[in-house]
């Protein structure tokens, strides 16, 4: 009964969002994006960690692509991890809560960032973790999460990659350009939906959780939890990042992480 009441309370919190915020797909309620979008999606091309190309375009043009009014072979995703809702979509700030009051009260702080997400179904966020307490609110569509608790760290591989960026050439094709002066990036090489257990046999011991977050629902994603994210086409979401406390939980994770690295070297 208590869990059911809590779930109803969360849904009620999201249901209180104004209709304009829940129906951002209507052209009248969409502002223009006047800065380059910065997707979270990272691409792994063999031995490189390739950041996506960033493109400046009117937001209306982006919507035409998502709604298939314009054909494009590329994958488009609007996301920038620096509170882009408040920085780039100021017209919508009054339509979405600036924070989640009960979470702010529980943590004794306001969110560091409020992020806006909108993209195609082909845009996938690879497995990673964040140093934030994350409240993920789906306004339209669905998000599909695959989750690992921090205790699964010994079974999750990391490798070092040469950082690079996709750039568009004059003929419209993409080329990968290395960032030669940058240090190599540690990243998870494994696709949790289709893991190569011959190459990474330890992952077979991990216990992934999967959940679907539907419109009007909210997911609390604790800091340091690994997550891989997919979405339905045109899914609209807002998430709230609260900085984590670097307390005993963080120290425990650091211990597990370092022991995992030591064992991997031996």
Predicted feature residues:
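N-terminal accessory scaffold of Fe(II)-dependent oxygenases
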Residues: 2-218, 226-266
């Amino acid at each position: 009964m208590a869990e059911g009441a809590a779930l109803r309370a969360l849904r009620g919190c999201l249901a209180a969002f104004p209709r304009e915020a829940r129906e951002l797909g209507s052209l009248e309620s969409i502002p223009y994006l006047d800065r380059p979008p910065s997707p979270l999606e990272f691409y792994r091309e063999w031995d490189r960690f390739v950041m996506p190309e960033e493109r400046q375009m009117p937001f209306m043009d982006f919507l035409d692509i998502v709604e298939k009014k314009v054909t494009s072979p590329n994958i488009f995703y609007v996301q920038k991890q620096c509170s882009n809702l408040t920085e780039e979509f100021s017209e919508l700030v009054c339509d979405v809560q600036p924070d989640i009051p009960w979470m702010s009260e529980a943590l004794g702080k306001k969110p560091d960032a409020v992020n806006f997400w909108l993209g195609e179904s082909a845009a996938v966020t690879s497995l990673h973790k964040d140093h934030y307490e994350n409240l993920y609110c789906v306004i339209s569509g669905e998000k599909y999460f695959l989750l690992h608790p921090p205790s699964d760290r010994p079974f999750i591989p990391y490798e070092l990659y040469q950082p690079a960026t996709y750039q568009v050439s004059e003929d419209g094709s993409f080329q990968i350009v290395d960032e030669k002066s940058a240090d190599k990036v540690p990243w998870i090489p494994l696709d949790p939906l289709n893991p190569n257990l011959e190459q990474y046999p330890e992952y077979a011991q991990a216990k992934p959780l999967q959940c679907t977050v539907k419109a009007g629902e909210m997911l609390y994603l604790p800091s340091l939890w690994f997550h891989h994210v997919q979405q339905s086409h045109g899914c609209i979401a807002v998430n709230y990042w609260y900085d984590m406390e670097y307390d005993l939980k963080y120290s425990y994770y650091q211990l597990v992480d370092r022991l995992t690295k030591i064992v991997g070297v031996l």
